[in-house]
């Protein structure tokens, strides 16, 4: 026969209706049914007058079904059978014509083998494969249309199938068929190639010419042993490659069949892509719900038509590769829960969107099935390319090689990327799926790239934060005395260098291998497996699909959510404007600071800057900020005297400690990744707990949203963003706040710092727990966002109370540890300050004491005695100087003694005290100081005594300046004025010709011009001696001389006049003891004369 009879029978298909099985008596059916089944072979049986399709009724099939395992399809009988009965052809061919009543019965022929012998006989004359694929598919659909006419019979024979009688969509029977077939296989013995005869041989390419119609193949029950011996779950999913219409139909039967298995339809919202956990956790039947479409029936079709149908067959054989079998076997044997989800996705995969619950389930099983899903996606993906090929043999080989190659590449890339990522990257902590919501391939690709970038940025950020955690742990252990006192920043330099290398390598790979990386993220990265098979059509096989039928894909899928073609540009908020403005300022300061650091302090600060530079570069790229003054992780560079960052309310600096020491401690502890507003230690346990808590709440929220969006909006679990969190905190709706510790430092009014302080203040007022954990990017990944998130507010943690309580406990411990660490560091810093004060270099009387307070401040008179010593000699022997001064004071009046104490503490300042007079023009000031210094130097030249004399001079100067500080102030004023004078004189002296003296006094001072001439010094000495004699102001002169002697201590060493300071000191002491009252009375006059004399001396010189 040709296809003409087929077409003819299609026209006559309406006549099949009278032959409904129930219209015949059972006795008439028993005879023909018994003959073939009892004999085990139909070869010797006479054709029966009754149509064989009538024998498919339930009672007969059930009785004799087990005997039909042997070849029933003899050509003679099958060919002769229809001749006596004119209805034979009619019942057979209407299958192709999609006649509902007959097709209903043939739907179950696949399960009940009785009619197969007769049916197949009609088609034996067709030697060529039936190539009309789409007709075959339509026929299959037609076959499944009226499956519900026999629900009760099915229920009787196969009790596991439910008794649903309502009409179902096309394809809804397919899951039933697979379920029933599985049970039939369990009932009957293994079948030995029942279909191995000419027309039904299934496997090899040699049987191409003997393949029957696709419809018959789909209805064939007795399969080759390689297929029949497999369990249902082991069959491959060729349904994936059916036409798009078939894919769309497959979703509905899945929903209905799953509802038959006990899950309500509310649990399965195929349109929204939501599947409840109850659904996916069903028994093996549930696993077969969607896999059935793709698996068993298509396996039958493809195996029966191995060479007949072009791409259906190809995909079938391609998917029968061993990896699939192994995976499915694992599913069928033990891993039902996990693999069920994968296989269940196979049916939905073609629909192009996965469900949120599936994402969550996959998220849980991700670590176990990561490689499995990647291999599965690779197995299924290259098969999409098979659509282009018709040479099955050649493509078979190609497909195998392609699969292996792709998978190897995939594993290489995934392992490479994951190995290169930092050990504690959020891949190990933040395991959330990437929310690819679009169904358009191009947009999905862009979303995928964004997701990849977000993942890598999160990994980098968290690696930096983990370094910060290590630093804090070291500080904690150091505070507890567990480690030596090596500075933390030494180790951090290496860590930063390593991190920089990692980041550069990642960026290089991202630039060069963008495409493979995106593939890797889809399958391998733990937080990317939404379900790799589910994502496949849009991600990995995207090139094939795009070139093949991208239009069809785009049009066949309903868009989920709002998707704007052109995103509307958002106007920056007030906060964003402030942030952007300060960023620009910081960038400007970065260039200036960089130049300054490179020029002024090439050794010490340059090293600090290098250490911090990689982090600054990263921060510029990631968040747009650039602030070298932050000096991200090196505490040494953060020890600048004044940190302009407002002290956070939770930090120790706000606890009433007003000393600069506390603020410097805070500056040393905190960095760009651990800002000052944090008052707890960062640790991994808190990060993990926060991640789990947020993921749990997000899953709750999404699940409710899938069921009832209105209710979900009313019962939100989370809120993100500073503005939203602040708004809801004002409404007292927030139960917990999670803040990122690495928010950008924006100190302008209305900036980020102010907003964060407001949030923390409100949390304190409302007694809401606030936690500092993760980082901005990692926090965003926890809540399924690709953008960074600074603050997350929790409305309701019901359902995750254990995690929440654990988080609160960990936070309290971290806060206590932070306080201990700060206290220990403050104590340590104070100790170091006492030890290292002497070693700090000073310049022109400006002290650099621990509090960073300059000598300019009046209040620092008492607090700065040590650091005010300028000469190296005095730095090392300041205690001797104090003792000497005390001894001299004892010989003086009590008033002078008091003044001595105040000023003796600052012997280095006193050298400059005489110039305070010199708040006049430089010449005048120099006059007084030069006269005094010249006298001091002349005396020094006369006596040339050793440095102990210098110490005496210093003490005498201190006492003298106590009584007369050179600014016409008496003892009452002297202590305060002396402090002011200490700085100004030095500054003035720098400007004067006494650069020589200064140079000698301060060899380390930057202004060092040695232009001292012995003749000039001698003239100064002689003039100062004259003034001393005439004015009888030995004290004043001595004081000025002492100033000059201090400043010119080195000058004295170089010049031979070093001897005279001792003489002057003796004369000064004698004068001081002789006439303290005269000193007071004639302060101003003597000073004025000194000025004139000094001017004269300078002019003469």
UniProtKB/Swiss-Prot annotation:
SUPFAM superfamilies attached to this UniProt entry: L30e-like
Bias-annotated ranges (Low complexity): 255-265, 925-939
Extent of Acidic residues compositional bias: 988-1002, 1040-1057
Origin: domain of life: Eukaryota
Chain intervals for the UniProt region annotation (Disordered): 154-206, 240-295, 320-387, 884-1010, 1030-1101
Compositionally biased tracts (Basic and acidic residues): 356-371, 892-908, 940-950
GO cellular component terms listed in the entry, alphabetical order: mitochondrion; ribonucleoprotein complex
Intrachain disulfide bonds: none
Phosphoserine modification, residue list: 276
Keyword field contains Phosphoprotein: yes
InterPro entries the record matches: Ribosomal_eL30-like_sf, Ribosomal_eL8/eL30/eS12/Gad45, SECISBP2
Keywords: Phosphoprotein
Polar residues bias locations: 327-346, 954-964, 1030-1039, 1070-1087
Entry's Gene Ontology molecular function annotations: mRNA 3'-UTR binding; ribonucleoprotein complex binding; RNA binding; selenocysteine insertion sequence binding
Function: Binds SECIS (Sec insertion sequence) elements present on selenocysteine (Sec) protein mRNAs, but does not promote Sec incorporation into selenoproteins in vitro.
Name of protein: Selenocysteine insertion sequence-binding protein 2-like
Native source species: Homo sapiens
């Amino acid at each position: 026969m040709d296809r003409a009879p087929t077409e003819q029978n299609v026209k006559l298909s309406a006549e099949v209706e009278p032959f409904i099985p129930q219209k015949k008596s059972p006795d008439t059916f028993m005879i023909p049914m018994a003959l073939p089944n009892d004999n085990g072979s139909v070869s010797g049986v006479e054709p029966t007058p009754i149509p064989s399709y009538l024998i498919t009724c339930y009672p007969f099939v059930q009785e004799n079904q087990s005997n039909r395992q042997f070849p029933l399809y003899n050509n003679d009988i099958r060919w002769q059978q229809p001749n006596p009965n004119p209805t034979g052809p009619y019942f057979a061919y209407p299958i192709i014509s999609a006649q509902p009543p007959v097709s209903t019965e043939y739907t179950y022929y696949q399960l009940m083998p009785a009619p197969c012998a007769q049916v197949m006989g009609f088609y034996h004359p067709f030697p060529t494969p039936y190539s009309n694929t789409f007709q075959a598919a339509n026929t299959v659909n037609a076959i499944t249309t009226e499956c519900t006419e026999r629900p009760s019979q099915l229920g009787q024979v196969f009790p596991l199938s439910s008794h649903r009688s309502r009409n179902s969509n096309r394809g809804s029977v397919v899951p039933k068929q697979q379920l029933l077939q599985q049970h039939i296989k369990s009932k009957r013995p293994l079948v030995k190639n029942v279909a191995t005869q000419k027309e039904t041989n299934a496997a090899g390419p040699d049987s191409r010419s003997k393949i029957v119609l696709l419809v018959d193949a789909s209805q064939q029950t007795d399969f080759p042993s390689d297929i029949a011996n497999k369990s249902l779950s082991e069959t491959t999913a060729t349904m994936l490659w059916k036409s798009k219409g078939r894919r769309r139909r497959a979703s509905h039967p899945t929903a209905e069949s799953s509802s038959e298995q006990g899950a309500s339809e509310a649990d399965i919202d195929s349109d929204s892509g939501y599947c409840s956990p109850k659904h996916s956790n069903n028994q093996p039947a549930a696993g077969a719900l969607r896999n059935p479409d793709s698996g068993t029936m298509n396996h039958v079709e493809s195996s029966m038509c191995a060479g007949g149908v072009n791409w259906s067959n190809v995909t079938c054989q391609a998917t029968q590769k061993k990896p699939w079998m192994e995976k499915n076997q694992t599913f069928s044997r033990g891993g039902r829960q996990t693999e069920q989800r994968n296989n269940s996705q196979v049916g939905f995969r073609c629909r192009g969107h996965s469900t949120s619950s599936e994402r969550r389930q996959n998220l849980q099983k991700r670590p176990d099935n990561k490689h499995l899903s990647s291999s599965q996606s690779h197995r299924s993906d290259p098969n999409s390319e098979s659509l282009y090929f018709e040479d099955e043999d050649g493509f078979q080989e190609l497909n195998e090689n392609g699969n292996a190659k792709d998978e190897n590449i995939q594993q290489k890339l995934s392992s490479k990327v994951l190995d290169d990522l930092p050990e504690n990257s959020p891949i190990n902590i933040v395991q959330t799926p990437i929310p690819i919501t679009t169904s358009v391939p191009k947009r999905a690709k862009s979303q995928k790239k964004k997701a990849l970038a977000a993942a890598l940025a999160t990994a980098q950020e968290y690696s930096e934060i983990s370094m910060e955690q290590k630093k804090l742990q070291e500080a904690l252990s150091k505070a507890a005395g567990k480690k030596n006192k090596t500075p933390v920043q030494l180790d951090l330099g290496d860590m930063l260098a390593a991190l920089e290398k990692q980041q550069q390598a990642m960026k290089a790979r991202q630039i060069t291998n963008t495409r493979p990386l995106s593939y890797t993220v889809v399958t391998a990265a733990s937080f990317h497996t939404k379900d790799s098979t589910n994502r496949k059509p849009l991600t990995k096989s995207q090139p094939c699909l795009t070139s093949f039928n991208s239009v069809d894909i785009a049009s066949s899928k309903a868009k989920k959510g709002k998707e704007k073609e052109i995103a509307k540009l958002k106007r920056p908020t007030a906060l964003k404007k402030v942030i952007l403005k300060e960023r620009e300022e910081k960038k400007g300061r970065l260039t200036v600071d960089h130049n300054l650091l490179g020029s002024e302090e090439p050794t010490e600060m340059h090293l600090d800057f290098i250490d911090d530079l990689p982090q600054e570069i990263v921060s510029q790229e990631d968040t747009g900020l650039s602030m070298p003054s932050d000096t991200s992780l090196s505490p040494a560079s953060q020890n600048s005297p004044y940190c302009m960052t407002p002290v956070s309310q939770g930090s120790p600096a706000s606890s009433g400690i007003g000393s600069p020491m506390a603020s410097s401690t805070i500056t040393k502890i905190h960095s760009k990744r651990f800002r000052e507003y944090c008052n707890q230690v960062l640790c991994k346990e808190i990060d993990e707990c926060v991640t789990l808590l947020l993921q749990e709440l997000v899953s709750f929220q999404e699940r409710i949203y899938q069921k009832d969006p209105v209710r979900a909006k009313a019962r939100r679990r989370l809120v993100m963003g500073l503005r939203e969190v602040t708004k809801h905190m004002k409404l007292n709706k927030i139960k917990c706040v999670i803040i990122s510790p690495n928010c950008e430092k924006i100190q302008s009014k209305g900036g980020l710092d102010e907003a964060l302080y407001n949030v923390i203040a409100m949390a304190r007022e409302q007694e809401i727990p606030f936690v500092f954990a993760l980082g901005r990017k990692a926090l965003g990944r926890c809540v399924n966002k690709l953008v960074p998130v600074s603050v997350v507010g929790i409305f309701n943690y019901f359902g995750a109370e254990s995690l929440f309580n654990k988080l609160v406990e960990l936070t309290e411990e971290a806060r206590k540890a932070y306080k201990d660490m700060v206290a220990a560091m403050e104590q340590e810093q104070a100790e170091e300050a006492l030890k290292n004060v002497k070693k700090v270099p000073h310049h022109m009387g400006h002290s650099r004491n621990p509090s960073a307070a300059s000598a300019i401040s009046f209040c620092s008179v008492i607090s700065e005695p040590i650091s005010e010593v300028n000469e190296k000699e005095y730095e090392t022997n300041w205690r001797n100087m104090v003792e000497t001064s005390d001894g001299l004071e004892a010989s003086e009046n009590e008033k002078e003694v008091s003044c001595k104490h105040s000023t003796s503490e600052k012997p280095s300042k006193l050298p400059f005290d005489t110039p305070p007079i010199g708040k006049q023009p430089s010449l005048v000031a120099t006059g007084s100081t030069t006269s005094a210094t010249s006298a001091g130097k002349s005396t020094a030249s006369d006596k040339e005594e050793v440095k102990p004399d210098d110490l005496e001079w210093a003490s005498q100067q201190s006492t003298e300046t106590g009584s007369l500080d050179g600014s016409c102030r008496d003892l009452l004023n002297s202590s305060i004025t002396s402090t002011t004078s200490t700085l100004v004189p030095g500054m003035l002296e720098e400007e004067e010709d006494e650069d020589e003296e200064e140079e000698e006094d301060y060899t380390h001072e930057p202004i060092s011009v040695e232009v001292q001439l012995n003749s000039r010094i001698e003239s100064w000495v002689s003039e100062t001696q004259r003034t001393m004699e005439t004015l009888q102001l030995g004290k004043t002169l001595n004081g000025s001389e002492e100033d000059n002697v201090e400043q010119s201590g080195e000058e004295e060493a170089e010049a031979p006049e070093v001897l005279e300071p001792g003489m002057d000191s003796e004369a000064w002491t004698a004068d001081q003891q002789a006439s303290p009252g005269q000193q007071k009375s004639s302060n101003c006059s003597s000073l004025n004369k000194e000025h004139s004399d000094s001017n004269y001396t300078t002019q003469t010189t």
